[in-house]
């Protein structure tokens, strides 16, 4: 059996090959991230029989290489870089060089025999890319809202007394045309009242009058052109991001309708299209896990609470180990599912009746929701309570 270790970089990779005993069969050899480099790699490796290729899952650089090797029939394992670094340190290879990493990865594979991985199907990969793009847009949107808050606090701090949400279309429409308190000078109430902010609604006379009067006595009136430009740019960015998020949400939902598991997950009350897409993006097929408990452990939702004497833990059931982003994404769907799913609501209420704190009971409900996710994926059927393990139902 041959074990190939490949250290991944942006432009040049390094490979090394060892046998079952760790004896070096191919000394560390570099190859480039292009067609010529891949040809060199395949020439060195030869036939894929009795060969395990091990790669560190570093950023996105491994994906083209993985696809090329998989198409040639190689078994490929994706490794956590932290595990390979720890292995190298234990092997007294403490000097960080690409050559040592390639050999260390190969020897790690020879000793640990990691299971081969596989790329997700194209539909899952597309959902994953779009969900993560949406995450970035949401982050950008939040950044712009925070920037706008800072600017409004300086240029027209009284504005948020009348328009609470600066991320709303109402706020960005007004602030784009009237970015600071000084910009309201000479503006009539009637003109401001006619301003449309979503194609249908107008500001209205009451709000217009309040803003015009507040601007006259605002403590931010001294701010000038620099603030006006920044506010306008922030509003334009928010409008653009809002349109992109709407379009992207529609794209994700259309893709989800073509995804078998993703569509089935929406049959669970509380799991809408965006949550189902998130589950598919982060988990692939939930049925790939050994059982529902393994899925819950991967997410980082544990079944028991820690108690000592009279102390009752308020964060029981959550562990820092696991998928924090997925846990956060499941919080609101769990609240919805507790309201809409009779079996989950009964389970939650039973825990509360036993004296469990609301947060502890909700974490337990999240775990049961994940068990339902696993059952739907495993049976490839829409959600029905009797397919969920007995412990999940009240």
Q: How would you describe each model-predicted region?
A:
Residues 1-394:
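A detector of single, family-specific signature residues
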């Amino acid at each position: 059996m041959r074990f190939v270790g490949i250290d991944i970089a942006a432009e040049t990779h390094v490979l090394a090959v060892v046998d079952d005993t760790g004896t070096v069969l191919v000394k560390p050899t570099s190859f480039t991230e292009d067609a010529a480099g891949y040809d060199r790699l395949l020439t060195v490796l030869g036939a894929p029989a009795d060969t395990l290729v091990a790669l560190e899952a570093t950023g996105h650089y491994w994906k083209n290489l993985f696809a090329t090797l998989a198409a040639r029939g190689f078994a490929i394992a994706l490794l956590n870089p932290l595990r390979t670094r720890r292995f190298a340190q234990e092997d007294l290879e403490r000097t960080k060089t690409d050559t040592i990493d390639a050999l260390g990865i190969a020897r790690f594979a020879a000793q640990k025999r990691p299971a081969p991985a596989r790329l997700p199907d194209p539909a899952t990969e597309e959902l994953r890319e779009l969900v993560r793009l949406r995450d970035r847009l949401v982050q950008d949107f939040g950044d712009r809202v925070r920037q706008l808050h800072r600017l409004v606090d300086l240029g027209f701090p009284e504005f948020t007394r009348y328009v609470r949400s600066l991320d709303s279309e109402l706020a960005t429409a007004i602030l784009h045309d009237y970015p600071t308190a000084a910009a309201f000078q000479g503006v009539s109430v009637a003109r401001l009242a006619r301003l449309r902010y979503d194609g249908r609604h107008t500001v209205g006379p009451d709000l217009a009058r309040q803003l015009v009067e507040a601007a006259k006595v605002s403590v931010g009136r001294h701010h000038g052109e620099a603030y006006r430009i920044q506010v306008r740019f922030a509003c334009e960015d928010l409008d653009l991001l809002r349109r992109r998020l709407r379009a992207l949400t529609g794209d994700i939902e259309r893709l989800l309708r073509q995804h078998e598991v993703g569509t089935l997950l929406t049959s669970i009350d509380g799991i809408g299209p965006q949550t189902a897409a998130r589950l598919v993006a982060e988990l692939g097929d939930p049925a790939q896990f050994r059982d529902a408990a393994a899925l819950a452990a991967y997410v980082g939702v544990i079944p028991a609470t820690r108690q000592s004497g009279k102390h009752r833990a308020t964060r029981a059931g959550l562990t820092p180990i696991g998928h924090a982003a997925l846990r956060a994404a499941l919080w609101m769907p769990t609240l919805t599912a507790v309201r809409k799913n009779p079996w989950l609501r009964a389970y939650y209420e039973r825990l509360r009746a036993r004296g469990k704190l609301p947060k502890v009971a909700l974490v337990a409900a999240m775990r049961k929701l994940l068990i339902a996710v696993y059952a739907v994926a495993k049976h490839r059927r829409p959600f029905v309570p009797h397919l969920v393990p007995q412990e999940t139902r009240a």
